[in-house]
From Swiss-Prot:
Record protein name field: Bifunctional purine biosynthesis protein PurH
The MGS-like domain, residue ranges: 1-145
Record-linked Gene3D superfamilies: 3.40.140.20, Methylglyoxal synthase-like domain
Comment field on protein domains: The IMP cyclohydrolase activity resides in the N-terminal region.
Stated family: Belongs to the PurH family.
Annotated GO MF terms: IMP cyclohydrolase activity; phosphoribosylaminoimidazolecarboxamide formyltransferase activity
Keyword NAD: no
Signal peptide: none
One of the protein's GO biological processes: 'de novo' IMP biosynthetic process
A Pfam family hit: MGS
Length: 508
């Protein structure tokens, strides 16, 4: 008795060769629509699904395979007498292999300004039903959703007369993943068009970009996945030069890109272990980089530098003077790129324009925390001067600069800035005075005349008192402590201007 295969694919890579090999191995081929036409034109003896079902394709192809003679053939358990009786009574022929991939929903919604009606017409109904049926009945049916598996299946059939059960189980798992991914894309597309910000059930579809050499540490396996439709940022960077990106490279580069995005004026950002170690704005990218380097010439070594403008020759010449892991920018002058590429191991990334507002996810054991991204802008109307002295124009400019930076520093965080440059950064301490002392110590003499930004309020006046001793002249912080008045009084005694934003920027 010949075996039967059902083939219906939107991605037709390798499908003709696969069908011909199945035919040579004694399989009867049934198919639908465009796949049927392609196979027939290519010389494959193929039967139309409508000939099997005795029912024509209707509604413009919306209904083709949703029929007992198809699903009964796929789902029949071959060693159950009642199933075999049903097959015989209703003239249903078992289907032993199903090769299907689905309507191009992802590709459709990835295009700009796609009408809802077009997206809906690219939601596959019959395909997922057949895939799931075949995967459920993996003990008897081989299901293929990926052309990469065609050759393995052919080889096993040649060797054993059928695929091995362990192979069918693996392919079934892959098939269920395929339909789950497909349904997640559809769900996310529809969810975005509603007000379901935090729905009862949430799914996210990501596809693998690459396997990584290892994770955060060499003993951890890792891979990188991206949003297949609304991808941006590090996931869409074009690598122009250098070694393959590591797990830590990607994580650090992401932090650099997020901080760079805060600024419209030319900015240079140096990142180490996801924290900024030097940030500066300037009249040009070149000036910004020189200032960012001088902010902390020790920590920048082995770090990542990102820009929001085209890297020129002068900047490239400065960049190659030290060891850096990555340089990121939206563009590079041709000669500048050649200079950077002279460093064999330097990774050079071109940042793609565009941004998509999505959830911020934090994995915890047994669950996931979902929140809006911390993207609130500092509203001028929310700035409240709480001290007797208001900041000068220069101080206010530096305060706003420091406020943008402190948002991207691990809490508890303090940033000192002067003339559009960070001069001291206190990172990730368990109280607020320690990062203050850390930042002041790093700044040294540069602390005098600088401003201070804090990601959260001051529970005690000790931060203000330390700032006064360091020569800091202005402070920006959220406010909201029950001891705010003590900090205000300390600032007034020292002649420090202080403003409250009403916004906290914890980062964990």
């Amino acid at each position: 008795m010949s075996r039967r295969a059902l083939i219906s694919v939107s991605k037709k890579d390798g499908i003709v060769e696969f069908a011909k090999k199945l035919e040579d191995l004694g399989y009867e081929i049934i198919s639908t629509g465009g796949t049927y036409n392609l196979l027939k034109e290519s010389g494959v003896k193929v039967i139309k699904v409508s000939e099997v079902t005795g029912f024509p394709e209707i509604m413009g192809g919306r209904v083709k395979t949703l029929h007992p003679k198809i699903h009964g053939g796929i789902l029949a358990v071959r060693d159950k007498k009642e199933h075999l009786k049903d097959l015989n009574d209703h003239g249903i022929v078992p289907i032993d292999l199903v090769a299907i991939n689905l309507y191009p929903f992802k590709e459709t919604i990835s295009r700009e300004k796609v009408a809802l009606e077009e997206a809906i017409e690219n939601i596959d109904i019959g395909g997922p039903a057949m895939i799931r049926a075949a995967a459920k009945n993996y003990k008897y049916v081989t299901v293929l959703v990926d052309p990469v598996d065609y050759e393995k299946v052919i080889e096993e059939i040649k060797l054993y007369g059928d695929t091995k059960e362990e192979t069918r189980f693996y392919l079934a798992a892959k098939a269920f993943g395929h339909t789950a991914f497909y349904d997640s894309l559809i769900y996310e597309y529809f969810r975005e068009k509603t007000n379901m910000e935090f729905p009862k059930v949430i799914t996210f579809a990501y596809e693998k970009v690459q396997d990584l050499r290892y994770g955060e540490n060499p003993h951890q396996k890792a891979a990188f996945y991206k949003n297949p439709v609304k991808s941006y940022g590090i996931a869409e960077c074009l690598q122009l030069h250098g070694k393959e990106l590591s797990f830590n490279n990607i994580n650090d580069a992401n932090a650099a890109i997020e901080l760079v995005r805060e600024f419209s004026e030319p900015v240079a950002v140096a990142i180490k272990h996801t924290n900024p170690c030097g940030v500066a704005v300037g009249n040009s990218i070149y000036e910004a980089y020189l200032k960012a380097y001088e902010a902390d010439p020790v920590s920048i070594f082995g770090g990542i530098v990102a820009f929001n403008g085209k890297v020129d020759v002068d900047t490239a010449k400065e960049l190659v003077k030290i060891f850096l892991e990555i340089v990121i920018a939206p563009d590079f002058e041709e000669e500048a790129l050649e200079i950077l590429m002279s460093k064999k191991n330097l990774r050079v990334l071109k940042l793609k324009e565009g941004y998509y507002r999505e959830f911020d996810l934090k994995k915890v054991e047994g669950g996931v925390l979902v929140q809006q991204k911390d993207e609130i802008d500092l509203d001028e109307s929310s700035i409240k001067v709480v001290t007797k002295r208001a900041p000068t124009g220069k101080e206010m400019k530096d305060l706003k600069f420091a406020w943008k930076v402190v948002k991207h520093v691990k809490s508890n965080a303090i940033v000192l800035a002067k003339d559009g440059v960070t001069v001291g950064i206190g990172v990730g301490q368990v109280n607020r005075i320690w990062p203050t002392e850390q930042a002041i110590k790093q700044a040294g003499e540069r602390a005098k005349g600088s401003v201070l930004a804090s990601d959260a309020f001051f529970p005690f006046p000790d931060v203000v008192e330390a700032a006064a001793r360091g020569g800091i002249t202005a402070i920006i912080q959220p406010g909201g402590s029950q001891n705010d008045q003590l900090s205000i009084e300390a600032a007034d005694r020292a002649g420090i201007a202080m403003i409250f934003t009403g916004i906290r920027h914890f980062k964990h």
